[in-house]
Amino acid sequence: AECMIDIADAAGLPSYLKPKGEKLLREKPLMKQMFQELGIASPRYKKIRLDTLEEDFADMAFPCVIKPVNGYGSHGVFVANAIEDVRERFQSTAAQSTFDYLMAEEYNDGREFNIMTWIVDGQAHIISIADREKIAFEDGEIPQVVRCAYPSPLTAELQDEAASIATKIAGYVGLENGPLCVQAFYREGEGLAVCEAAGRIFGYEHELVTLGSGLSVEELLIDCVYDQPAAKERVLAHSPLFANHAAGLYFHGHDGEVADTSSIDELGALPGVVEYRPYYRTGDTISHERGAKPYVVRYYVAGPSRESVDSLSRTIMGRASVLDPDGNELLLRTAPMAH
């Protein structure tokens, strides 16, 4: 989104957001300052520098999530349990950004949600609220997303609060019509605490909106460019309380050569699996270098109820396997989180 917005602005082409507004959604210190000014709850954070770590963490509670200021995705992000963890990995994380300092954010262990909204004439309308389920595979590493389930059972309860938050953010960044997504945490009795916001649609998930509700995000984006009235009509007619249920299952792996994918191929043929995509085949090498494939394998599943989707998810997560030439398991083991 950032590159598209910059190119559109330089070329004098219309776009739903200007670079100044996008910068507020890309640079984490500016984003956190925005949340503070808008009165939006967010995990406590600090700018941290290598030569002042003791002072910077004086009033912070561990564990903390350490992030580059304007990195992409989860590159360089890690969980620190002590100042020594930060000192050890400071330089490698700073290398993922154009800034020489990092962001430390107190870890929130509440339920996590991916919230898609579409702004229409300055007002946010909820497209979807999904459960974002994660697992930490190694100490010190950030939990990885293993499943996103649509819609969350808490959608009806949270949609008004989520829309209010997104409307405030849209107004601050100058977004009148277009996509705005939010990642947020929730603890009962505390409301939503926003982690991040982005002026785009979540990757590897928009298909789940279509499976659950019938709304085509691709057509909505096209209408946003060529037929704004039609885009508004689509959004205003949409309900985040989907008629059907869907989930994306995302499998991560160890580095290594792939020899046997027969298990994941068989699971891809199960009833209820709508789309199955292996990113690696026999002879390929799983890697985590920059630019590597995002997952080892991905499944989209759908069903008439959350129970049916959960059951199929458990089956796939329990049986999926990718082996190396010596018969060793390459997949990191996953299981759906219980709520």
How would you name each of these model-derived features?
Residues 1-27, 39-47:
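A short, GP-enriched loop/loop-strand-helix hinge that lies immediately N-terminal to
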Residues 78, 106, 150-151, 295-303:
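Short, well-ordered beta-strand elements within core beta-sheets of diverse protein domains
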Residues 31-36:
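Structural element of the ATP-grasp superfamily
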Residues 54, 223-339:
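Peripheral (often C-terminal) accessory segments that flank ATP-dependent C-N-forming ligase machineries
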Residues 41-43, 63-66, 77-114, 140-148, ...:
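Conserved ATP-binding module of the ATP-grasp superfamily
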Residues 105, 176-188, 233-234, 329-336:
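A short glycine-rich, hydrophobically flanked beta-strand micro-motif that places a catalytic Asp/Glu
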Residues 190-193:
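Conserved protein kinase catalytic/activation segment
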Residues 84, 106-109, 113, 117-175, ...:
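ATP-dependent carboxylate/phosphate-activation module, predominantly the ATP-grasp catalytic core
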